[in-house]
Amino acid sequence: MKRYLRWIVAAEFLFAAGNLHAVEVEVPGLLTDHTVSSIGHDFYRAFSDKWESDYTGNLTINERPSARWGSWITITVNQDVIFQTFLFPLKRDFEKTVVFALIQTEEALNRRQINQALLSTGDLAHDEF
């Protein structure tokens, strides 16, 4: 009888475990780093330290470095470029560039949200309007 009860309890646990589904956790507002040089990493750190926004989408900071001229920094949201700048290796006006990038990115995100709300083009693909 005890053996029979153990089998029933074990079967109950297996059926209960089979009905459980993992809950997918979404982390809103990620800021990802796709930089490769030291100036790019410094820009990402300075930008992310000062970034205080309630934006729930994901931002990506990309870099195309040049050994001679510096780095081309691009900030994108869902593959849409919202800010671009050129950074010199000597960090000339570095803090001003970071603050300017923060202001321009925030304005671009606000404009983007307004455009999405006003241009309700749900039946069109992104490249059709």
Swiss-Prot record:
UniProtKB keywords: Signal
The protein's name in its UniProt record: Curli production assembly/transport component CsgE
Keyword Signal: yes
GO biological process, any: protein secretion by the type VIII secretion system
Signal peptide: 1-22
Function: May be involved in the biogenesis of curli organelles.
A molecular-function term among this protein's GO annotations: identical protein binding
InterPro entries linked: Curli_CsgE
Gene: csgE
GO cellular component terms, semicolon-separated: cell outer membrane; curli secretion complex
Species this protein is from: Escherichia coli (strain K12)
Keyword Transferase: no
